[in-house]
A protein has these predicted regions:
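Flexible, low-complexity linkers/stalks enriched in Thr/Pro that connect modular domains
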Residues: 26, 30-44, 124-134, 213-226
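Short, solvent-exposed loop/edge segments of extracellular or virion-exposed proteins
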Residues: 45-58, 137-148, 224-237
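Extracellular beta-sheet repeat scaffolds used for adhesion and glycan interaction
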Residues: 1-11, 16-20, 31-32, 72-123, ...
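Short proline/glycine-enriched turn/loop motifs at strand-loop junctions of beta-rich domains
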Residues: 65-73, 155-162, 245-252
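Generic structural detector for well-ordered beta-strands
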Residues: 5, 36-38, 64-66, 96-98, ...
Length: 266
């Protein structure tokens, strides 16, 4: 390994350097290309290290950059900060922007002045500040009594995001649009459900208030009937009575040759 750092280089980017070795009997190696590099020994050279998250719900976000030299930080565009010193000398500098309003930022810059020599502007990545949580409203409730164990529910969200479920209900539908959204609950056992709710978390991690799903009952089991009093036989009564027991209320359906004006089981 041969290290040569004796010959000073001017500031700039070097992308055409090569090295070759000639041995004692004048055999010369192929050229070894040196990877491109930049010198910032007089004029600071800046590089982005950690971008501002995009989007973010933090209105005082951090930004990290590297400077080849220490100096005074200068800000441009719509961003500013109380952090005014860049450490340089192979260390990263993290700045915290002053409070930003909600919105889209694409013109922020930083530069460093070292010994009166300013760097070029380093453009901060574009980012959006979003501190407003989604707002949800019920559109179509679950039927209060339903024999569908995978019922639908429709709600409105004013922002897109991830749907999060709570209580005894869940669903494979996990993405909400900024519109009406119809979800299908995963299979539910026969029971009454009164603790189900949904929330939506937007792309900036703002989470809505819980939207409570209306109380509903899943009932997929048909009524069970038992004979109580048979029609007497033989009988001379052509409007004979018949008694039965049902474990559920409902509408009576007649079949065969018999009919009645009684239409409801109690």
């Amino acid at each position: 390994t041969q290290t040569d750092n004796v010959t000073p280089l001017d500031d700039g980017t070097y992308d055409n350097c090569t090295i070759a070795v000639t041995d004692n009997i004048n055999n010369t190696s192929d050229n070894l290309p040196v990877s491109s590099f930049t010198i910032g020994a007089v004029k600071p050279i800046l590089l982005q290290v950690t971008a501002v998250p995009n989007p973010t719900n933090n209105n005082t976000p951090n930004y990290t950059f590297f400077s080849t030299l220490p100096g005074t930080i200068n800000y441009g565009g719509s961003c500013d900060s109380n952090n005014t010193s860049a450490v340089g000398e192979d260390n990263n500098t993290t700045i915290t922007f002053n409070t930003l309003n909600e919105g889209y930022y694409d013109n922020c810059t930083v530069s460093v002045t070292s010994n009166t020599v300013p760097s070029d502007n380093l453009s901060v990545n574009s980012f959006t500040i979003d501190t407003t949580a989604p707002s949800l409203n019920q559109v179509t409730p679950v039927p209060t009594s339903d024999n569908d164990s995978t019922p639908n529910y429709t709600f409105y969200s004013n922002q897109a995001g991830e749907i999060i479920y709570g209580g005894n209900c869940d669903s494979s539908d996990t993405s909400a649009d900024a519109d009406n959204n119809t979800i299908t609950f995963n299979a539910l056992a026969d029971a009454t459900y009164s603790d189900c709710y949904i929330t939506v978390r937007d792309n900036a991690s703002n989470t809505s208030d819980n939207l409570t799903v209306n109380t509903f009952t899943i009932d997929t089991t048909g009524p069970v009937l038992d004979n109580v009093t048979n029609v007497p036989t033989p009988t001379s009564d052509n409007t004979s009575s018949y008694s039965f027991n049902s474990n559920e209320t409902g509408a009576i359906t007649y079949g065969g040759s018999c009919e009645s004006t009684y239409s409801a089981a109690v």
